[in-house]
């Protein structure tokens, strides 16, 4: 969101009132915004997100359908939340297929990524903290005017089963805790408390406002440390939360995707595994330092 310039006090009330009455299409809304900016001599044309954030709770629920941004992202009724694990070396070392990793030409970034992907940049902003990343992504869905009551989380960033067991458990635990805490904070009555949401996230605000980001991060971290439970308890709570994680995906390699790994992942709530099968030729696997054989690939597929 761009920095807000001085605005006429009647600008947003007039605009919101018109949207409530007319229920405009996106093109009609764009034209009316231009017309109203000329009338009030306002140089900054507000985005749909800015309009939504200037509405009170009652108006916001009425005009949200006219202001929803990027509706295809949740058109299926499920919101995808991609979270990134911290940069970490694969147990066997680096292979030709992975551009990233610790000490890569892109810096210290997660394996298989360059640091320029949206999910990676979100991870960097939130210091690869699963709890903060989930809060940040849910915040983005809300300001886009989208529903996020059913979430499909994809844990990205490398061979997840190759991370230390405590890290894996903690990462999944804080993901579930974030969904539950976000639900309690902003959906305690069953519907979005927009006033509480805007107050917590210091909205309306400016993209890139470091002071605002620091304040929000401090609030999120304070929540993270409160009322710590077990993973099983958070998963049970999530079954009835306003925002439910209905799918959990991890990434791994064939040699880290055998039956023992699958059983552990099932206990942690994982519902889907992305198995990286780069080639079906042993010679290519050897030359690219992949760290496993075609036999391992076949065994992994059979086991999982």
Regions found by a protein language model. Give the residues of each.
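Radical SAM/AdoMet-radical enzyme domain recognition
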Residues: 180, 206-304
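Flexible, acidic/Gly-rich N-terminal and inter-domain linker regions that tether
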Residues: 1-223
């Amino acid at each position: 969101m761009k920095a807000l310039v001085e605005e006429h006090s009647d600008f947003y009330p007039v605009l919101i009132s018109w949207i409530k009455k007319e229920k405009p299409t996106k093109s009609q809304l764009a034209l009316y915004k231009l017309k109203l900016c000329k009338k009030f001599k306002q140089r900054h044309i507000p985005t749909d997100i800015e309009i939504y954030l200037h509405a009170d709770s009652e108006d916001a629920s009425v005009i949200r359908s006219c202001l929803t941004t990027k509706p295809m992202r949740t058109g299926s009724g499920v919101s995808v939340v991609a979270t990134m694990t911290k940069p970490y070396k694969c147990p066997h070392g680096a292979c030709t297929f992975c551009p990233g990793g610790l000490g890569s030409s892109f810096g210290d970034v997660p394996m298989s990524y360059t640091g320029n992907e949206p999910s990676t940049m979100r991870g960097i902003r939130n210091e690869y903290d699963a709890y903060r990343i989930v809060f940040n992504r849910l915040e983005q869905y809300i300001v886009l005017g989208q529903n996020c009551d059913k979430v499909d989380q994809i844990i990205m960033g490398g061979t997840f089963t190759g991370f230390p067991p405590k890290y894996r458990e903690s990462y999944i635990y804080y993901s579930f805790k974030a969904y539950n805490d976000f639900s309690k904070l902003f959906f305690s009555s069953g519907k979005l408390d927009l006033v509480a949401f805007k107050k917590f996230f210091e909205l309306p605000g400016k993209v890139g406002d470091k002071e605002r980001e620091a304040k929000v991060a401090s609030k999120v971290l304070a929540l993270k440390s409160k009322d710590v439970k077990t993973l099983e308890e958070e998963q049970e709570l999530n079954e009835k939360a306003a925002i439910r994680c209905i799918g959990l995906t991890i990434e791994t390699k064939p040699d880290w995707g055998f039956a023992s790994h699958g059983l552990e992942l099932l206990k942690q709530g994982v519902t889907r595994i992305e198995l990286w099968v780069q080639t079906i030729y042993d010679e290519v696997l050897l030359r690219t330092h992949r760290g496993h054989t075609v036999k391992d690939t076949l065994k992994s597929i059979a086991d999982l």
